[in-house]
C-alpha cells in the first residue's frame, strides 16, 4: 500500500531530458508523476523505468483506444513497467473494457498488488458542450455523457475514471458505488485556463470528491516548483489528513 498523496505531476514535455530534470527537482516533495502520450512517444518505456528507479509512482496516461485485442496486448506490455495507473478510453466499448479489466485483475492477483489502477477517460477537459456535439455527434449534454461513460466503466469493472472537476459531484451522487475519480484541469487560479475548458482549484476539486489531482503546467512551468507544491499542500492539508 502506497501512502496516499493526491498530487500527480504531469510531465508534459517533448523530450526525456527535460522531464527528468524537472522530476529530479521536485521528487523530494512529490512522488506521483504522469507520463502522457507526447513524452512516451519520444522516450518510450525508458522514461517510465527511469522514473521508477528514482523511487516514484508512474501514471501511464496513453488513453488506449483500439480493438480489444490490440489494447489488451499493449496493456500487457505496459504492465511490465509496474505502473501506478493506466488509462484507456471508455468509448472503446464494453468488450475492450472487460478484456482489459480481466488482464489487469490477473496481473494484480499474480503479483499480490492493488496496482495499477485501471482508469477510464470520460470526456476530455478540452471539450465543452459545443465540441461534444460537433465532434462526436452526441445529443446528450456533456454531464449526461460523462455520467453515461462512468457508469459503463463501473459496470465493466474499472477502478476509476478521469473526469473534469465540474463532473465530480455528479459522479459521486449518481454512481452505484464509490470509484476513484482522477481529475485533470487543475489550475491554481481560475483566470488561467490554457487549453482546458473545465477547470477548478486543488482544494475545490478535493472538496467535491476527487481522489487524485493531475497538475502540470502550474508546477512544471514555475520558476519555483517547490513553492507551488508547498502552497498547494498548505491549501489541502486538512482534507488529505482526513483521508489517511
Curated annotation (Swiss-Prot):
Annotated binding of substrate, by residue: 12, 34, 61-70, 125, 187, 196, 216-217
Cellular component GO terms held in the UniProt record: cytosol
PROSITE patterns: OMPDECASE
Cross-referenced CDD domains: OMP_decarboxylase_like (cd04725)
GO aspect biological process, one term: 'de novo' UMP biosynthetic process
InterPro entries noted in UniProt: Aldolase_TIM, OMPdecase, OMPdecase_AS, OMPdecase_bac, OMPdeCOase_dom, RibuloseP-bd_barrel
EC number from the UniProt entry: 4.1.1.23
Active-site feature positions: 63
Keyword Lyase in record: yes
Keywords, comma-separated and alphabetical: Decarboxylase, Lyase, Pyrimidine biosynthesis
Reactions catalysed according to its record: orotidine 5'-phosphate + H(+) = UMP + CO2
Molecular function GO terms recorded: orotidine-5'-phosphate decarboxylase activity
Pathway assigned in UniProt: Pyrimidine metabolism; UMP biosynthesis via de novo pathway; UMP from orotate: step 2/2
Subunit composition and interactions: Homodimer.
Family the UniProt entry places it in: Belongs to the OMP decarboxylase family. Type 1 subfamily.
Protein role: Catalyzes the decarboxylation of orotidine 5'-monophosphate (OMP) to uridine 5'-monophosphate (UMP).
The protein's name in its UniProt record: Orotidine 5'-phosphate decarboxylase
Species of the source: Dictyoglomus thermophilum (strain ATCC 35947 / DSM 3960 / H-6-12)
